């Protein structure tokens, strides 16, 4: 198997469905020979065309991301669930091999979205999971061109590698951290909060969380260059110091008042799930930020996601 490009609703009813996602479909495979709501005698098929659509065209970049995550999961699971750890590592290696074979047939430029950046992170996690030296050697050969192309994108992966590299690596990384420091200082000129505020169609608290995590590790390894105070800027923004209602964007956490309405599994109740992190303040051209706390269905402002919540836990 491989990563799917998309899993999508096939009918409008599914799209605006509220409540438990387990009831999104009837749980039967669609059979057009049956009438709507009719269930086959064997209890496996129905005449209701509500099956989800999986788009199965293969993107090796998605496979690399999956390989990275599976390798990291394998390392974390070892000693707790060894069978699952072994299965995760096996699939990580398989996806890594197959993705590289596919990309060799259709090469893409190095850098963000290209094989260089993705491979560096995957090689690092596979080394952590296996201890096999060829992975860390490949990582070391790839990370520097990745940083040269875009230090803001690559610095987090580079910092993750410090515990597994020698002192020469940290010395070589130092000027890149200094360059990253120039970027984070420039944020004070962009906005009064000193964090990367997104201006796209999806609100930008995810960028703020990632920024906070990166500067936290940078201050741990290079405290003479980057102060931990930068991480507090990210925390302040998430917990309410932002240009709208000053509510915390994290459910149940925050000094003034946490947001009480999120787009999640209980969105029909105009409620929240503790720990949800909202995308936050959506920029409306030409000069307005907004985050509605009385209407959950604007998912670009209010949706709590697994990826976003996990990133916050790490931060």
Where in the sequence are the language-model features?
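Aromatic (Trp/Tyr) and acidic
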Residues: 9-65, 69, 120-134, 138-141, ...
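Aromatic-lined, polymer-binding surfaces characteristic
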Residues: 59, 63, 67-77, 85-130, ...
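Acidic, Ser/Thr-rich low-complexity linear motifs
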Residues: 108-113, 193-201
């Amino acid at each position: 198997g491989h990563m799917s490009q998309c899993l999508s609703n096939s009918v409008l009813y599914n799209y605006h469905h509220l409540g438990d996602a387990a009831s999104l479909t009837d749980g039967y495979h669609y059979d057009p020979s049956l009438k709507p709501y009719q269930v086959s005698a064997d209890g496996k098929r129905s005449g209701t065309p509500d099956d989800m659509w999986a788009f199965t065209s293969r993107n090796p970049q998605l496979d690399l991301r999956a390989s990275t995550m599976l390798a990291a999961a394998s390392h974390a699971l070892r000693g707790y669930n060894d069978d699952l750890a072994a299965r995760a590592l096996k699939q990580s290696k398989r996806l890594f091999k197959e993705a590289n074979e596919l990309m060799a047939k259709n090469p893409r430029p190095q850098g963000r979205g290209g094989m260089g950046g993705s491979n560096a992170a995957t090689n690092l996690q596979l080394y952590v999971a296996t201890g096999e030296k060829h992975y860390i050697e490949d990582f070391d050969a790839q990370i520097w061109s990745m940083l040269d192309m875009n230090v803001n994108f690559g610095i987090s992966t580079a910092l993750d590698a410090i515990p597994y590299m020698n002192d020469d690596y940290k010395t070589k990384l130092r000027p890149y951290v200094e360059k990253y420091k120039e970027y984070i200082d420039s944020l004070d000129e962009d906005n009064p909060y000193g964090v990367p505020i997104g201006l796209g169609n999806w609100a930008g608290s995810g960028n703020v969380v990632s920024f906070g995590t990166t500067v936290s590790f940078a201050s741990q390894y290079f405290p003479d260059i980057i102060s931990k105070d930068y991480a507090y800027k990210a925390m302040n923004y998430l917990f309410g110091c932002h240009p709208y209602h000053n509510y915390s964007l994290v459910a149940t956490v925050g000094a003034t008042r946490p947001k009480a309405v999120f787009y999640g599994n209980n969105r029909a109740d105009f409620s929240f799930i503790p720990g949800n992190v909202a995308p936050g303040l959506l920029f409306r051209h030409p000069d307005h930020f907004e985050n509605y706390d009385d209407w959950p269905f604007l998912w670009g402002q209010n949706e709590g996601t697994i990826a976003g919540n996990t990133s916050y836990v790490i931060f």
